[in-house]
Amino acid sequence: MEVRNNNKVNLCFSFDNLRNELSRPYGILFINNKIFLEFISKSIQRGSRIITVGDYVSRVLEENGIVPFLEVIDGKTKRTITQNRAITRNKEYKVTNEAGKIRFEIFEIMENILKDREGGVVFVDGEEDLLVIPVTLSANHGDIVIYGQPNAGAVVIIVNEMIRWRVRDILEKAIVKEC
């Protein structure tokens, strides 16, 4: 396949073969919102940036006065359209990402956004669930990445080299396909 002279590579990582592996939490699972919010507040006090992937966890934080550094949302919770957001941000980005996949370009986009000192909101046309992977790989050591575990609670990843190694291991098992 020729990709030279083409600004956009239309390739994705596909995770159909990894559904079972990806269904378990890859961090600390919080099932109690009070304890979860206390942990996040202490993390902010220690200087950690908070990054959320998912509408529900983003909304829980916002409703409790915590505005994440970066939110990655698709406007849906459990595939159901959610209400409009109450908080607006200075920087808003739009990306496209199909369900069960991660577009190659998302990795560079997330890296650039996370280098920015302002953060913001990434609106995903499609599905954001798997974008925890590029976010975790691009986040700073000590950043907190939060995503929802359906019917269980919120999963908190404290970014370090060990978790990056685990994420790269998952990524190596994914299948590269045309989007």
Swiss-Prot record:
Reaction catalysis annotation: 3'-dephospho-CoA + GTP = GDP + CoA + H(+)
Binding site for GTP: 55, 57, 74, 76, 128
Species of origin: Saccharolobus solfataricus (strain ATCC 35092 / DSM 1617 / JCM 11322 / P2) (Sulfolobus solfataricus)
Similarity annotation: Belongs to the GTP-dependent DPCK family.
EC numbers, comma separated: 2.7.1.237
Keywords assigned by UniProt, alphabetized: Coenzyme A biosynthesis, GTP-binding, Kinase, Nucleotide-binding, Transferase
Entry annotated with the keyword Nucleotide-binding: yes
Functional summary from the UniProt entry: Catalyzes the GTP-dependent phosphorylation of the 3'-hydroxyl group of dephosphocoenzyme A to form coenzyme A (CoA).
Pathway: Cofactor biosynthesis; coenzyme A biosynthesis
Record-linked Pfam families: DUF359
GO MF annotation list: GTP binding; kinase activity
InterPro entries, per database record: GTP-dep_dephospho-CoA_kin
Keyword Kinase part of the UniProt annotation: yes
Identification of the protein by name: GTP-dependent dephospho-CoA kinase
Biological process terms in GO annotation: coenzyme A biosynthetic process
Top EC group: transferase
